[in-house]
A protein has these predicted regions:
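Active-site entrance/lid segments in N-terminal catalytic domains of soluble metabolic enzymes
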Residues: 1-98
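Acidic, glycine-rich active-site loops and adjacent beta-strand->loop/helix elements
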Residues: 7, 76, 108-109, 131
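Conserved active-site-proximal phosphate/metal-binding subdomains
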Residues: 81-104, 110-249
Length: 249
């Protein structure tokens, strides 16, 4: 379960109530610092907590707040990448040197090469997102899966920087229009209309790939086919082990 900041008001207390009722084992929060009142409720119930952030400074705050692990999210990643422009290659070793809790590296990781690189940089594990979009189990429309599988590493762009909420998204007509509106200092309401969840729903539910905005990592350039989730995870582990053995030979 994930608790993320959003552009619209969200009652996280209701989410926590359901989390506790359903015995969710792990919860990830995101942002500058995890909400300590929610952390207390979760930890008292035995729920493991993780916090996703885009800087070591925020990771240290999360550690101080009492989370069990921290995810460092590099600017290659798909989604809200912050305003620092720091890559996973920099964040992972910095966090490994600075933190005592386990760290996960995220952003731009989609195969065994990325997994092994993250471990070499000091991470205890990785988080993957975009790779799981292009899987058999992912419930997005087949049109969108095929479009993402055909994309390259050049087919993403950061948007919403004008709202101080930078998001790396797939470069479709809707995302390009958002970038155009931002550069012309258009009314914020025009921008928000394009990134509304109702527009994104047209994309992932009905296959209208030109509508809406969807988070997408630069790792899309190394994703070329739809696979079962098991095959993705197993393939990553096997590839990482094979490269490790080759380097050790």
């Amino acid at each position: 379960m994930s608790l993320f900041p959003a552009l619209r008001p969200i009652d996280n207390d209701l989410y926590v109530e359901v989390i506790l009722q359903e015995d969710v084992p792990v919860v990830e929060t995101s942002g500058h610092r995890p909400p300590e009142d929610l952390l207390e409720l979760l930890k008292a119930a035995g729920v493991k907590t993780m916090h996703k952030c885009v800087s070591v400074r925020h990771a240290l705050s999360a550690q101080e707040a009492g989370v069990d692990a921290v995810t460092l999210f590099g600017s290659e990643g798909g989604g809200h990448i912050g305003e620092y422009g720091l890559s996973t290659m920099i964040l992972a070793p910095r966090a490994a040197d600075a933190l005592e809790v386990p760290i996960l590296a995220a952003g731009g990781i989609a195969d065994g090469r990325g997994l092994l690189a993250a471990l070499a940089l000091g991470a205890d594990g990785v988080t993957i997102g975009t790779r799981l979009l292009v899987t058999e189990e992912c419930p997005i429309h087949q049109n969108l899966k095929e479009a993402l599988a055909a994309a390259t590493e050049l087919d993403t762009l950061p948007i919403l920087g004008s709202l101080h909420n930078t998001l790396r998204a797939w470069k479709n007509p809707a995302a390009l229009k958002v970038a155009e509106l931002e550069s012309s200092q258009a009314d914020m309401r025009e921008i928000l209309a394009l990134v509304a969840g109702t527009e994104t729903k047209r994309m992932y539910q009905h296959g209208e790939v030109d509508a809406g905005v969807i988070a997408c990592s630069q790792s899309i350039g190394i994703i070329s086919e739809t696979k079962p989730v098991y095959a993705v995870i197993d393939g990553m582990v096997r590839e990482a082990a094979m490269i490790r053995d080759r380097l050790a030979a």
